């Protein structure tokens, strides 16, 4: 049996990447939220690594930022800094039509509150705000949530296998330090 080589595509903060068979999309998340899109009917998958929940309403200056597409090492990369723009980028980069949205499956990961004191009001916990907004944005976009692993104090690693269409979310335990 021939061994198939799998290419790992790491999605950094603020990026959106699209994967296809033979690739695994991964991200390491703390308070950031990872948004995974699954469209197995076309064997296309996407992952966004979002730093914050919402973008400002200010217009974007560059044409690359407007389309949500730039090139990095030959890989198409979109605008994933904010949850709202990341969802737009994923839909655009995966060429998802309105009538196809119900076929899409979405997973969410991250949104941990890793470095805030325990007495911080919930409205100021970046991870909690990101997680809550991501859930609302997915629902508002008419997308179907397959699963999530959000909140708490631990970071996470999300992987999307573009061969099998399976995903894995692993919690990353905290080592030392105080909260």
From Swiss-Prot:
Enzyme category, top tier: hydrolase
Listed InterPro entries: CheD-like_sf, Chemorcpt_Glu_NH3ase_CheD, Cytotoxic_necrot_fac-like_cat
Known role: Probably deamidates glutamine residues to glutamate on methyl-accepting chemotaxis receptors (MCPs), playing an important role in chemotaxis.
Highest taxon of source: Bacteria
UniProt keyword terms in alphabetical order: Chemotaxis, Hydrolase, Plasmid
Keyword Hydrolase: yes
Organism: Ruegeria sp. (strain TM1040) (Silicibacter sp.)
Protein name: Probable chemoreceptor glutamine deamidase CheD 2
Coiled-coil features, chain-numbered ranges: none
EC number(s) recorded for this UniProt protein: 3.5.1.44
Family assignment from sequence similarity: Belongs to the CheD family.
């Amino acid at each position: 049996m021939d061994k198939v080589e799998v290419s790992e595509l790491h999605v950094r903060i603020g990026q959106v990447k699209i994967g296809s068979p033979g690739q695994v999309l991964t991200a390491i998340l703390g308070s950031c939220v990872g948004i995974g899109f699954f469209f197995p009917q076309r064997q296309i998958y996407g992952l966004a690594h979002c730093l914050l929940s919402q973008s400002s309403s200010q217009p974007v200056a560059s044409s690359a930022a407007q389309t949500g597409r730039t090139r990095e090492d030959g890989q198409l990369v979109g605008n994933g800094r904010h949850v709202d723009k990341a969802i737009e980028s994923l839909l655009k980069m995966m060429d998802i039509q309105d009538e196809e949205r119900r076929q899409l499956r979405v997973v969410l990961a991250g949104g941990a509150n890793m470095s805030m004191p325990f007495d911080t009001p919930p409205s100021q916990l970046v991870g909690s705000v990101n997680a809550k907004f991501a859930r609302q944005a997915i629902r508002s976009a008419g997308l179907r949530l397959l699963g999530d692993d959000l909140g708490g104090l631990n970071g996470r690693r999300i992987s999307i296998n573009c061969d099998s269409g399976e995903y894995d979310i692993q919690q990353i335990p905290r080592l030392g330090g105080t909260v």
